[in-house]
Curated annotation (Swiss-Prot):
It comes from Mesocricetus auratus. GO terms for biological process: oxidative demethylation; steroid metabolic process. It is an enzyme of class 1 (oxidoreductase). This is Cytochrome P450 3A31. Heme binds at residue 440. It is found in: Endoplasmic reticulum membrane; Microsome membrane. Induction: Induced by phenobarbital and repressed by 3-methylcholanthrene or dexamethasone. The keyword Iron applies. The gene is CYP3A31. GO terms for cellular component: endoplasmic reticulum membrane. Its main location: endoplasmic reticulum.
Length: 501
């Protein structure tokens, strides 16, 4: 049947007008960059540029940086992203105008009680929570926590030794995921969990928190249609798995009750330090509420578990595939800790080459591949008009691979971070933990934890590639930076003396 004979001319005209109006509805915001002469990839109606992310957000960002230069425009749905790589503009966003204009991160969807977490909260609420949490991460508090973390380094060494004796290669993410969970639960809650040898609910619930993908239907729906967020909130829909949140909420509540019953104010874990804020706060309304304490506790797990285990996995892969670097680092460790002496906080943090290796790992594999801030008011920045509600995005991964700042950026060269070279590194180009007042609050804790783990492992073992090791390693296309295939390495004992065994 011929449609032209069935539908009248008026119907065809109405249909054509409807399609034009639909197209205009899906593209009417897309001229914001064109009017200002800002380049960028062409967006699709309603979708914007999100389909470009399928190849990997970091790959897409590198391509755009090469093609468009220091500033370009993207759209996620119809929301504009001003992408900047100019260091002065980055400094303005992350530091100078942090408190006035670029205070908040974007809404990533309905999050329930997690809206109280320090990394998600906004404006004055964020300032208050951040101020109360900051004393938890002083060098003095970290030194007190160091012996707690070291005992899990001993457990890690014992586990690796058993696997080495059996001739089993190890899947690094699984091993360091369990190690990270144990360290977090002990330092955050004072609870001893041996996830390496007895994986239980705590580890699995923690893993479930991290199953995040940009193309998850719920996440994609709020990116394309932000007006759905309050609707989801009213329906009690959350980006975080309900069973995991419920599990950790009960876990924190029970731990808190035990503390109150036995008056354990002397403890140095994060939970106790947060509980003590009730007593230490001069103004009662400034103290952390019970709900805020639960949110911070869960975000410690969410933020600390994957970042630490992934970075350690990447570091050991790089060391296994660069035996000269591994040997040099082992020599530094042996000199600092002769006869396999037990590490101390000061000794670990003073090791220069260890710091260089870890920084170069974080350059090559920054777990947070982007930094984003929401513009709270219309503002002109370096001649560019940024309207209220827009997102200003810093493509960290692309900056870390920019040959203008890093010669042969794809190569693993710890010497980039030597004393001689470190002074020339722009702090707004190397951004593994962000910068400014809203940088990663747990940065010092994470660095201490990772340095201790590397020290314990390399004191006792050498890492080698095996037949299961993917060389060269390819990155997954998922939102969280991770390898396409699990990193699997052979662990070889350095000698018969194993500390912590």
């Amino acid at each position: 049947m011929d449609l032209t004979s069935v539908l009248s001319l008026e119907t065809w005209v109405l249909l054509a007008i409807s399609l034009v109006l639909l197209y205009r509805l899906g593209t009417h915001k897309y001229d914001i960059f064109k009017k200002q002469g800002i380049p960028g990839p062409k967006p699709l109606p309603f979708l914007g540029n999100v389909l470009n992310y399928y190849k990997g957000i970091w790959t897409f960002d590198i391509e755009c940086h090469k093609k468009y230069g220091k500033i370009w425009g993207l759209f996620e749905g119809q929301r504009p992203l001003f992408t900047v790589t100019d260091t002065e503009m980055i400094k303005n966003v992350l530091v100078k105008e942090c408190y006035s204009i670029f205070t908040n991160r974007r809404d990533f969807g309905p999050v329930g009680i997690m809206s109280k977490a320090v990394s998600i909260s906004k404006d004055e609420e964020w300032k208050r929570i951040r101020a109360l949490l900051s004393p938890t991460f002083t060098s003095g508090k970290l030194k007190e926590m160091f012996p707690i973390i070291e005992q899990y380094g001993d457990i890690l060494v014992k586990f690796l030794r058993r696997e080495a004796e059996k001739g089993n290669p190890v899947t690094t993410k699984e091993v360091f995921g369990a190690y990270s969970m144990d360290v977090i639960t002990s330092t955050a809650f004072g609870v001893s969990v041996d996830s390496l040898n007895n994986p239980k609910d705590l580890l699995w619930k923690g893993r479930k928190l991290l199953r995040f993908d940009f193309f998850d239907p719920l996440f994609l729906s709020v990116v394309l249609f932000p007006f759905l967020i309050p609707i989801y909130e009213k329906l009690n829909v959350s980006m975080f798995p309900k069973d995991s949140i419920s599990f950790f909420r009960k876990f924190v509540d029970k731990t808190k009750e035990n503390r109150l019953d036995y008056n354990q104010k002397h403890r140095v874990d994060f939970l106790q330090l947060m509980m003590n804020s009730h007593d230490n706060s001069k103004d009662s309304h400034k103290a952390l509420s019970d709900m805020e304490i639960i949110a911070q506790s869960i975000i410690f797990i969410f933020a600390g578990y994957d970042t630490t285990s992934s970075t350690l996995s990447f570091a050991l892969y790089l060391l296994a595939t660069h035996p000269d670097v591994q040997k040099k680092l082992q020599e530094e460790i042996d000199i600092a800790l002769p006869n396999k002496a037990r590490p101390s906080y000061d000794k670990v943090m003073e090791m220069e080459y260890l710091d260089m290796v870890l920084n170069e790992t974080l350059r090559l594999y920054p777990i947070g591949s982007r930094l984003e801030r929401v513009c709270k008011q219309d503002v002109e920045m370096d001649g560019v008009f940024v309207p209220k509600g827009s997102i200003v995005m810093v493509p960290v991964f692309a900056l870390h691979y920019d040959p203008q700042y890093w010669p042969e950026p794809e190569k693993f060269r710890p010497e980039r971070f030597s004393k001689e070279n470190k002074g020339s590194i722009d702090p707004y180009i190397f951004l593994p933990f962000g910068n400014g007042p809203r940088n990663c609050i747990g940065m010092r804790f994470a660095l201490m934890n990772m340095k201790l783990a590397l020290t314990k492992v390399l004191q006792n073992f050498s890492l080698q590639p095996c037949k299961e090791t993917q060389i060269p390693m390819k990155l997954s296309r998922k939102a969280m930076l991770q390898p396409e295939k699990p990193i699997i390495l052979k662990v070889v004992p350095r000698d018969a003396i194993i500390t912590g065994a």
